[in-house]
Amino acid sequence: MKIALISDTHIPMSLHRLPDQLLKQIVGVDAIFHAGDITSSSVLDVLAKIAPVTAVAGNSDPPEVESKLADRELIQLEGHTIGLKHGHQPHELQINYIGQPYDSPEMELFFQLMTAQLPGAEIIVFGHFHRSVIMHWNGVLFINPGAVAATNGSCSFAMLELGASVNVQIIPLSSCD
């Protein structure tokens, strides 16, 4: 099973529409997971024409988008439990993890929180940071596909293949507009 992992599209605030390169590269996938900051339900409509979409709300999603989505999802596919959550945490936690390296103590706390919020997940897909990563932490595979609407000049998505083994690849987009 092939799943496109997308996050942080920020349409129409940062992009007017999904990049053609992205849309061409995800044709034929079995499912699409969007890890939040969609900001326009039209994004989900476009993606749903390609494959079934599972999406979660992000911190930038307006009420009309957020009200249609869960904060997190636990999905069973091909014998794997996949957690999907944007990654923003309650403000009262006061964690300074934005901009921190993924191997920092602040991110260690973030990974602990995400694991607790998505119990039983073997794979956790998240967004929010606009920085891609594929890493294992305490037996859980964490994947941030990066942002489709990048603020740092690079944009990307990821492809996850599930079967007897799990394979994931970050795919850079040549243009973020």
Which role does the model predict for each range below?
Residues K2, D30-A31, P52, N167:
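Residues at the starts of beta-strands that form the adenosine-phosphate
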Residues L5-R17, K24-Q25, F33, I38-L141:
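Conserved catalytic scaffold of divalent metal-dependent phosphoesterases
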